Design a protein with these regions (language model features):
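Preference for intrinsically disordered or flexible, low-complexity segments
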Residues: 2-249
Length: 249
């Protein structure tokens, strides 16, 4: 699935109309994708079986691939469904065409699970996550499917504006006066990522999702509504598509 320049410009007009001008951000130029910038993501309702890049909805995981379970035997919940055509065009990647990158997480309404999906640089935390408390799968598109106990109402990605996340030129005394972006975004620079050296040298940043951006009833998908989920894609995706974890500031 490709997102055309015309469609992105239309999205931009909608964002400006609905959200107004933000003096802290600049307009996006989509000609060469967003691999050299970070762009805010806002969301709108879409069908659960939509082929568009989205939060939630049904998975396209083929029947010959087992639904992912965490080490406790719990079925994971689909967080993101991302067509590789979209990722390739938007981030200048070289993933297999006509595939889907599916991101799953541990989620329980009534039990504490924050520590199972959180990573702040500790090796044991990363080991937990890679053992299957979250899962990133690259696969061909199968029929729509859901085996989780939960189905998040699907939310389509809409590109907003380019974000200025470069704080290196800002004096320390001025940092307290700056409103740092803490929402959902896609691009090459994350926001509020704690501990820059996470030991993910073989991965590159793809996008982040703010817990409060999930639909009503699922603001606790990352346990806390102000948690942020970070998606990193593996440069050697043949054996390990990526890693997904959360942080809470």
């Amino acid at each position: 699935m490709d997102i055309t320049l015309e469609a992105l410009l239309e999205h931009q007009q909608i964002v400006q109309k609905n959200l107004g001008k933000n003096p802290k951000v600049k307009n996006v130029e989509y000609k060469d994708g967003v691999e050299k910038m970070s762009v805010e993501i806002i969301f709108k309702d879409v069908e659960n079986e939509s082929i568009k890049p989205r939060l939630g909805g049904y998975s396209f995981l083929p029947e010959n691939i087992d639904w992912p379970l965490n080490p406790n035997g719990d079925k994971l919940t689909l967080v993101l469904s991302l067509p590789t055509n979209f990722l390739n065009k938007t981030l200048n990647l070289n993933l297999p065409q006509e595939h889907v990158l599916s991101v799953f997480t541990t989620y329980k309404k009534d039990d504490y699970f924050l520590d199972l999906i959180t990573f702040h640089g500790d090796k044991e935390e990363l080991k937990n996550i890679k053992n299957g408390f979250t899962k990133v799968l690259l696969h061909e598109a199968g029929d729509i499917r859901n085996e989780s106990d939960y189905l998040i109402p699907a939310q389509e990605f809409i590109f907003g504006e380019e974000l200025n996340l470069d704080l290196e030129a800002v004096d320390d005394e001025d940092l307290d006066e700056i409103e740092i972006y803490c929402g959902s975004l896609i691009g090459n620079i994350p926001s509020l990522l704690q501990i820059e050296n996470l030991g993910l040298d073989d991965y590159h940043f793809c996008l982040q999702i703010y817990g409060g951006d999930f639909p009503e009833g699922f603001h606790d998908l990352f346990s806390l509504s102000d948690s942020i989920g970070y998606l990193f894609i593996n440069n050697n995706y043949d054996h390990d598509a990526g890693v997904f974890f959360t942080q809470c500031t």
